[in-house]
Design a protein with these regions (language model features):
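Extracytoplasmic copper-binding redox domains, predominantly the cupredoxin/blue-copper superfamily
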Residues: 2-261
């Protein structure tokens, strides 16, 4: 995923009790998924669309009461439902419980990063591999306090939030943490110092997960031939699923449609 600023730094601090080595062990020990060479894998493509009227709470206006020189004046519009020309942005799509397939690609710059810049989390949504992640403060003179929580029970509609890490970051630079979900790949982030800063992540055990593009489209490539459950997650509207059959070297097209009805 594209991030603001470079994704590498030679002097990241380590926060909390889990080290980078422990994060690497989390990578190697991800139960239930085996990396293999995929010969003639297929591709799942599609698009997320939204139909009907937007919900009344699609955009929330929250007053900016701290650091106006960096965060801006007045209020922040938090866009919970981002629809452009019918495309539903800020959505995730992933294969459920795939047992084997392609290896994870290296993240841009060599590290997964959550950047805090202009009092915004950048990016708003991203897929990360469980393990090390850099929490970056790019706002000089601004104290940020990231709270990263595993969302348990999303698919049942009864969400319990388990904090993975929550700490203040008063100075610009990077702090290394560890993304280590116990029961759910769905993750929310917010800033305890600025109540208008939010974002989302997914941290699945396998790399067959993506965030949809600005036009609502997606592509999951190099999928071994077979039949799978494909799931879609929008943080406001929840989870949809469908069965897909992937052929060797072929494209499988899937459409997800959300609405308030």
């Amino acid at each position: 995923m594209a991030l603001d600023g470079a994704n590498s730094t030679p002097e990241a601090k380590t926060h909390g009790s889990e080290s980078a080595a422990e994060g690497d062990r989390c990578h190697a020990g991800a139960a239930g998924y085996k990396e293999i060479d995929v010969a003639s894998g297929g591709t799942i493509t599609g698009k997320f669309t939204f139909e009907g009227e937007l919900p009344v709470d699609a955009i929330e206006q929250i007053a900016i009461t701290k650091n106006p020189d960096v965060c801006g004046d007045g209020y922040r519009e938090v866009v919970w439902v981002d629809v452009q020309d019918g495309a539903l942005r800020g959505s995730f799509v992933f294969i459920e419980k795939i047992k084997e397939g392609k290896a994870w690609a290296e993240p841009e710059g060599g590290n997964y990063v959550v950047a805090q810049k202009g009092c915004r989390f950048r990016p708003w949504a991203q897929v990360v591999r469980p393990g090390p992640i850099l929490i970056r403060n790019e706002d000089p003179g601004v104290l940020h306090n990231i709270n990263t929580r595993e969302l348990i029970g999303v698919e049942k509609g009864r969400v319990v939030k388990r904090t993975m890490f929550n700490f203040g970051q008063p100075d610009p630079g990077d702090i290394e943490e560890t993304i280590k979900p116990r029961r759910s790949a769905y993750i929310s982030i917010n800033c305890e110092a600025h109540n208008f800063m939010f974002g989302y992540m997914m941290a699945p055990k396998h790399p067959y997960a993506v965030v949809v593009g600005e036009d609502g489209s997606f592509a999951i490539d190099n999928v071994p031939a077979g039949t799978y459950t494909l799931k879609a997650w929008h943080p406001r509207f929840g989870v949809q699923e469908t069965e897909v059959t992937v052929d060797t070297s072929g494209d499988t097209v899937v459409e997800f449609t959300y609405s308030t009805e």
